[in-house]
Amino acid sequence: KGDKTNVIVVSIPDYAYTPFGQGNSGVSTEIDFYNAYAKNYCEQNDITFVNITDITRQGLINTDLVASDGLHPSSLAYSFFVERILPLAINKLSD
């Protein structure tokens, strides 16, 4: 089996904050439930967890965070994801 110290778990983006999702609070609630479970699991098992959901929840206010399909994160959103994930990945790869 692999070494869990090399794993980074990323939260689920919230597509309710896109034109496709139309602010559906039920979707956000389910995503919060799953992300809380994943974060808790990671904390209990010493696995790195990165929250990117808050970035995607700005999608209805900042439409530049949503791709032209009205559903997926844009390249700008992904650049913010990378800002959070890359330093952790570099650290893990350098160990």
Question: Model-found features: residue ranges?
Answer:
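A short helix->loop->beta-strand "cap" motif at the edges of active sites that frequently abuts
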Residues: 1-6
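Catalytic His-Asp segment of secreted/periplasmic serine-dependent ester chemistry enzymes
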Residues: 14-95
